[in-house]
Structure formats: C-alpha cells, structure tokens
Regions:
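Short alpha-helix capping/helix-loop boundary micro-motifs
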Residues: 39-44
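C-terminal structural segments of small proteins and small subunits
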Residues: 56-90
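N-terminal first-folded block
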Residues: 1-35
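Short, flexible, glycine/charge-rich loop motifs used to bind or transfer phosphoryl groups or to couple energy/partner
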Residues: 15, 45, 69
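Pocket-edge structural micro-motifs
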Residues: 28-29, 45, 59
Length: 90
C-alpha cells in the first residue's frame, strides 16, 4: 500500500467490460512528509475520491480486484481509502 494524492482523472470512453462504471484516477505517490515521490500511477477509484485528496492505494493486482469486487478483471491498483491524517508521533 502507499499514500498518494489524486492529481487528475482519466476518461476512457471504451474499456474492458468488467471495468464499465469505474472511475480511473491519476495518483501521485507521496512520502510520509507529504512530498512527491516516484511517478504518477493510474488506479481505479473505490471510494469516490477527488482531485487533491490524499488517498490510500493498494497496488497488488489480486488485492485490488478483491477490494473492488472485480473478480478476474484487469486491475493493477485501486484507491481504497481517503487519508484524513498521518500521525508519526504515535
């Protein structure tokens, strides 16, 4: 899993049938300090996240499929939560 920020969405008028009705988000991975790290990833939105939201992303394909209830569909990453706060102090 990783924490990221939604930086945009991707519109696909044609896509795999099992992905019909899903939203595709562009997510910028963040480090624990909230700084950008790595390259932007594409993830299916499972929680109705929006631009600027900090989100929790699962990148294991099988886990993403299970969380979204998409069975054997071609899912690589999924947004599974909106992050309210990160507490590094414990």
């Amino acid at each position: 899993m990783l924490i990221g920020r939604v930086v945009g969405n991707l519109v696909a008028t044609q896509k795999y049938a099992k992905l019909e009705g899903t939203r595709l988000l562009l997510v910028q991975p963040l480090d624990l300090a909230g700084k950008d790290r790595g390259t932007t990833i594409l993830a299916i939105d499972g929680v109705d996240a929006g631009p600027g939201d900090r989100v929790l992303v699962v990148q294991d394909g099988r886990a993403a499929q299970l969380v979204l209830g998409k069975g054997t569909s071609a899912v690589d990453a999924a947004v599974v939560g909106v992050v309210d706060a990160v507490d590094l102090q414990g």
